[in-house]
Amino acid sequence: LANAEARPGVSFRLGGFETPLDGRRATVIRALNVLRQYDESEVEAAWATMRARLAPGGALVEGTCNEVGRVASWVTLEATGPVTFTISLRLAELDAPSIVAERLPKALIHRNVPGERIHDLLTTLDRLWATHARLGVYGPTQRWIAVAESLRAEGWPVLGARSRWKLGELTVPWSAVAPA
C-alpha cells in the first residue's frame, strides 16, 4: 500500500532501524508506533542506529499515536540526541490531557510515575485543564491556549506559540521530561 504513495522524492523500503537508503542519508525519519513492542532498554540503541542514518541537520521523529492519530506524542531527535518532546491532542472531546499517557514514547511510558518529570508535566496539564474549564464556552482551543500560557507562566519551558497550540500541540525541550 505504501508504494502506491511513492513519487519523486518520496519512497518506501522494507527495513528496520538501519533504514536502508543505498548509501544516502535521510532528512527525516518518522518512526511512529514502532518501539512500543521493544523493551525500554533497547530504545537508546534503536535511536542511535536511526540517528546515524540522518543527513546533517536531519531529524528523527519517534513516538506513538492512537489508531486514528488523535492522541499522539513524539520525541524529536537530532544527530546529538533528543531535542524536544511534543504532545498532540484532538481537543474537541478532550476530557484530560493526561489521556496521552497511554501513547507516550517507549522512553517515557514507564516513567509516568511520581518523581519523574513526565508525570509532573501530565499532572500539571490536567490541573491547568481543569482550572481553565470556564473557557470551554469559547471552545477547547481557547482553553488549550490558556493551559499552554499558564504552563509557561509556571516556569515550564514551553516552546512555540499559539499557532501550534491552536492545533492541540504542546512542545517542551527534552530536558524538561527526560527520565530522571
Language-model-derived ranges and their functions:
Residues A31-L35:
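Residues lining the SAM
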